[in-house]
């Protein structure tokens, strides 16, 4: 009988053990036998008007103070208002989810029956409620879906936990946490993002990028790109005041909305910006959101409560037993939450989630885009798993109001959940492991069990 040398024996045993461990994984990777049991769609509001007015009669910030030429007008007046095209795009997206969820078996096509299994919640502003209603009209066009929301001035603890009194924000800690990410030298951001600031200035003051010498600031105008970037105490909307970076973000905010809303090319950055140019400039806006909402301390304060309710909702669906703090009831199959990009950024940071879609910078929460959490069950093992993805219309799909089908879907990317995702193409995460990841991530003092 041939006897293996000792070292070869050990190596053989290791290979055999590895094969046994990987066997189920490889099988699961090649055949997806899971069935969708519940989905949580956490989306951003649709395309809107800018957050600042073009002009103001008295004191106060206005967009035209930042630019040589007047900012273009949108088809609808007002600040932070859902545009008609924005609403249309939300209905298109809702229609796509209708197709997908019907294919997956969560919807039957009988809207009056399916309505009983849908829970929809929106932060209490006209922009966000309007987005939710438009999405619902695509998801269940023949039903009148109730949009759950808090009536202002009451704050929704899911989306505004600090204002609602659920979470406490230590502003000094927030300043320290952000300052720590910048090495105590926030003005270094101006050097790191010099190309973006240079492009921003050329667009706002209407001269070719790269022109030398650089023109002086027009009389009576504010050069937001020269305002010092600092870290100081902010408010509940922007917990940390980042000085010039916040001013730049406000000035460039209209550009992505101009493009996505379908304004003529001559009115998108006054004809100076393509989709690629907007994406480059928006690295400044994205950096602001990253510091304000993806900083770990801030994510824990601002997003622990919504995360707690979402996890409880999944557990309730998996067990079939009512659970305190869960959204909907044990039979709820579809949960739609609509808020802002700040909310999505915070939740993503809490779980260390990242994504990248064509035409966008990393981790961008695009207008109407959504983090999607699928609760699925293996038909062979009965195990529940969580599958995460990010879904969004591309900039051109938004601009052109492109119809969506299963054959021509929005852009999407699977999202890896650190701490529990396995090495398959969809980064599946066993529900039990996801619950443990959530327990480690959620700051219990910033979460409650109320709806």
Regions found by a protein language model. Give the residues of each.
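Signature for phosphate-centric chemistry
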Residues: 29-117, 123-335, 339-451
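Enriched but not universal
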Residues: 3, 27-29
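Bacterial N-terminal signal peptides that target proteins for export
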Residues: 3-16
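Compositionally biased non-globular segments, especially hydrophobic aliphatic-rich helices
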Residues: 2-3, 20-22, 249, 441
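Bacterial N-terminal signal peptides
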Residues: 14-24
């Amino acid at each position: 009988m041939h006897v293996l040398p000792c070292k070869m024996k050990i190596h053989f045993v290791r290979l055999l053990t590895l094969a046994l461990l990987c066997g189920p994984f490889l099988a699961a990777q090649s055949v997806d036998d899971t069935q969708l049991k519940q989905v949580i769609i956490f989306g951003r509001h649709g395309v809107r008007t800018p957050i600042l007015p073009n002009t103001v009669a008295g004191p106060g910030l206005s967009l035209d103070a930042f630019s040589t030429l007047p900012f273009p007008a949108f088809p609808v007046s007002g600040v932070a208002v859902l545009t008609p095209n924005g609403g249309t795009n939300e209905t298109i997206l809702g229609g796509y989810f209708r197709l997908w969820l019907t294919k997956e078996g969560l919807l039957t096509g009988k809207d009056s029956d399916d309505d009983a299994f849908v829970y929809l919640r929106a932060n209490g502003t006209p922009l966000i409620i309007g987005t939710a209603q438009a999405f619902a009209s695509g998801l269940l066009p023949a039903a009148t879906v109730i949009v759950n929301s808090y009536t202002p001035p009451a704050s929704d603890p899911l989306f505004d936990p600090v204002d609602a009194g659920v979470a406490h924000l230590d502003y000094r800690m927030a300043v320290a946490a952000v300052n720590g990410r910048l090495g105590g030298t926030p003005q270094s951001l101006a050097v790191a993002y010099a190309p973006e600031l240079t492009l921003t200035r050329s667009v706002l003051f209407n001269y070719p990028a790269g022109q030398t010498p650089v023109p002086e600031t027009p009389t009576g105008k504010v050069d937001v790109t020269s305002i010092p970037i600092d870290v100081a105490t902010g408010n509940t909307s922007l917990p940390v005041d980042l000085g010039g970076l916040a001013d730049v973000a406000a000035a460039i905010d209209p550009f992505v909305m101009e493009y996505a809303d379908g304004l003529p090319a001559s009115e998108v950055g006054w004809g100076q910006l393509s989709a690629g140019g907007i994406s480059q400039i928006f690295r400044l806006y994205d950096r602001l959101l990253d510091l304000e909402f993806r900083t770990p301390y801030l994510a824990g304060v601002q997003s622990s409560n919504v995360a707690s309710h979402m996890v409880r909702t999944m557990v309730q669906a998996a067990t079939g037993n009512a659970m305190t703090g869960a959204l909907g009831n044990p039979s709820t199959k579809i949960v739609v939450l609509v808020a802002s990009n700040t909310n999505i950024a915070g939740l993503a940071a809490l779980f260390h989630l990242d994504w990248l879609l064509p035409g966008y910078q990393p981790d961008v929460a695009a207008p109407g885009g959504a983090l999607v959490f699928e609760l699925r069950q293996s038909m062979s093992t009965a195990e529940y798993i969580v599958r995460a993805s990010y879904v969004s219309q591309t900039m051109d799909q938004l601009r052109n109001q492109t119809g969506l089908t299963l054959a021509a879907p929005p852009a999407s990317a699977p999202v890896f959940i650190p701490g529990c995702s396995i090495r398959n193409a969809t980064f599946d995460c066993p529900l039990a492991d996801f619950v443990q990841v959530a327990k480690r991530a959620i700051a219990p003092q910033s979460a409650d069990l109320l709806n």
